[in-house]
Amino acid sequence: MNIQSTIKAVAETISTGPIPGSRKVYQAGELFPELRVPFREVAVHPSANEPPVTIYDPSGPYSDPAIQIDIEKGLPRTREALVVARGDVEEVADPRQVKPEDNGFAQGKHLAPEFPDTGRKIYRAKPGKLVTQLEYARAGIITAEMEYVAIRENLRREQDRPCVRDGEDFGASIPDFVTPEFVRQEIARGRAIIPANINHGELEPMAIGRNFLVKINANIGNSAVLSTVADEVDKLVWATRWGADTVMDLSTGRNIHNIRDWIIRNSSVPIGTVPIYQALEKVNGVAEDLNWEVFRDTLIEQCEQGVDYFTIHAGVRLPFIPMTAKRVTGIVSRGGSIMAKWCLAHHKENFLYERFDEICEIMRAYDVSFSLGDGLRPGSTADANDEAQFSELRTLGELTKVAWKHGVQVMIEGPGHVAMHKIKANMDEQLKHCHEAPFYTLGPLTTDIAPGYDHITSAIGAAMIGWFGTAMLCYVTPKEHLGLPDRDDVKTGVITYKLAAHAADLAKGHPGAAMWDDAISRARFEFRWEDQFNLGLDPETARKFHDETLPKEAHKTAHFCSMCGPKFCSMKISQEVRDFAAGKAPNSAELGMAEMSEKFREQGSEIYLKTE
């Protein structure tokens, strides 16, 4: 594989520049004036006499036309200076060197190119120093990352601006306005996390927590049979362009290390991984050959690269495995099945559970967050809410306290496949046993009958559990259960889950959520077609669907669409009724009613009139 051809392939496929109808804007910090917090701004037609609409924007520098993108150099490491300025980190004098097993022993033309060495420094905590966002928060310190998050969450709303709180939040504590101090308090209590490895200098900080906007994650990554560096970097940029707040690299084939390096260096969103996948590649795919030393080495490798959160299946304990024997679909988590196989082969307790304190100490030195994996999640609605699932969940609650003791941030992973009437119980159990640590769920899928449409079956459950309190939703694409998603599948999954997350925010009564809906509703009623397109989650698709039947520019000002036509448009008729009422005398309605009443009496006061 030629490195220059690979770079060229990536550069030609990624999308840059703003989303149609939008522009990139920034807001500076007050505590940290050097901060530039990004937003997507959509200006509406002057006839609306309305201010622009501000939308949360995780797309990074790629949507800013003023920034020159060079994939080979990676994104600017603007956060690095903030991390170093705190004085709590030191450069690693002897960073870990890349080994053949890190890339699955790939050689020659099968070895993906390394990310070019650009002089990046690798850091870890100084002995005895605070370095995690949780430790800073507990010490009463507001970090630059915390102010950054507060600004992002407010969507440029002013603190004294009145807001409408129309929703049911099920006991959450969502404020009218997010302050840096509120962010600090939520982090200190463990109710939110800011996944932000000190070695991810390219990161634009974000928060995951019940009292913040619901976030979504997109999964990418190669497999043993498909995908390249170019494919995965392109998917990363594409996913964040359409709204992915974090991205997980779930690569399982060769070249895991090199592909991950390209992804992190070009990512402004937090990157998560499942380290056991790479550890398994290092032992040639034989689960029984896994051991603590290989896993520990993999953790350090990924910490130094800049991975922001790890999914670790430490809750798959030996006593729980027999509980899955009578399930319809058994153990469906890849990480869970790997650890279950190891436990049974050795008839020993899960070494991730037994070595959990040591794992915490490694992660603490780099501020890598836990995403405690649900290795026993249900893979079918028939298996939902069983004893295996909830036994693991209770264990994750115990491990949460251990991680917090070490100063490490934690979120909890959840199911899976759960019918609608069982979803609320999942949220209730998680809050009860996991001490309000953020919940991060895969859907859940609410039915098993729709291969090819599981982005829809899961978005139903995602919207519900997001409303109940889940902090982040892991997307599902149309290819779920069928194959590796391509570029189009990634976009479909992201858009579907942004919709579910926003629906949850709206239902919870998030103070800024309804502003977006109201803006597009007014545009729809006033037939401002361009505003309707531009304010949507996917302006390109909205415009395409409209133009398939009404393609002319004149149709962009028409007071109808192709569904109802000019005579039957309900909104056009409503406008005519409104205009008629506005043009009549104040008592015209009463006079009209009196006229009809007199006519009724003249006809004999009969409800039904006889025909001639």
UniProtKB/Swiss-Prot annotation:
Residues annotated to bind [4Fe-4S] cluster: 561, 564, 569
Amino acids binding substrate: 219, 248, 277, 313, 333-335, 374-377, 413, 440
Free-text comment on the cofactor: Binds 1 [4Fe-4S] cluster per subunit. The cluster is coordinated with 3 cysteines and an exchangeable S-adenosyl-L-methionine.
Keywords in alphabetical order: 4Fe-4S, Iron, Iron-sulfur, Lyase, Metal-binding, S-adenosyl-L-methionine, Thiamine biosynthesis, Zinc
Recorded consequence of changing residue 481 to A: 5-fold reduction in catalytic activity
InterPro entries hit by this protein: ThiC (IPR037509), ThiC-associated_dom (IPR025747), ThiC/Bza_core_dom (IPR038521), ThiC/BzaA/B (IPR002817)
Keyword Iron-sulfur appears in the UniProt entry: yes
EC numbers, comma separated: 4.1.99.17
Pathway: Cofactor biosynthesis; thiamine diphosphate biosynthesis
Coiled coil location: none
Enzyme class: lyase
Key word Lyase present: yes
Listed GO MF terms: 4 iron, 4 sulfur cluster binding; phosphomethylpyrimidine synthase activity; zinc ion binding
Residues that coordinate or bind Zn(2+): 417, 481
GO cellular component, one term: cytosol
Cofactors that this protein relies on: [4Fe-4S] cluster
Catalytic activity line of the entry: 5-amino-1-(5-phospho-beta-D-ribosyl)imidazole + S-adenosyl-L-methionine = 4-amino-2-methyl-5-(phosphooxymethyl)pyrimidine + CO + 5'-deoxyadenosine + formate + L-methionine + 3 H(+)
GO terms classed as biological process: thiamine biosynthetic process; thiamine diphosphate biosynthetic process
Pfam families named in the record: ThiC-associated, ThiC_Rad_SAM
Top-level taxonomic group: Bacteria
Effect on the protein of changing residue 417 to A: 5-fold reduction in catalytic activity
Family to which this protein belongs: Belongs to the ThiC family.
Function: Catalyzes the synthesis of the hydroxymethylpyrimidine phosphate (HMP-P) moiety of thiamine from aminoimidazole ribotide (AIR) in a radical S-adenosyl-L-methionine (SAM)-dependent reaction.
Quaternary structure, from the entry: Homodimer.
Name listed for the protein in its UniProt record: Phosphomethylpyrimidine synthase
Lineage: Bacteria, Pseudomonadati, Pseudomonadota, Alphaproteobacteria, Caulobacterales
Gene symbol of the encoding locus: thiC
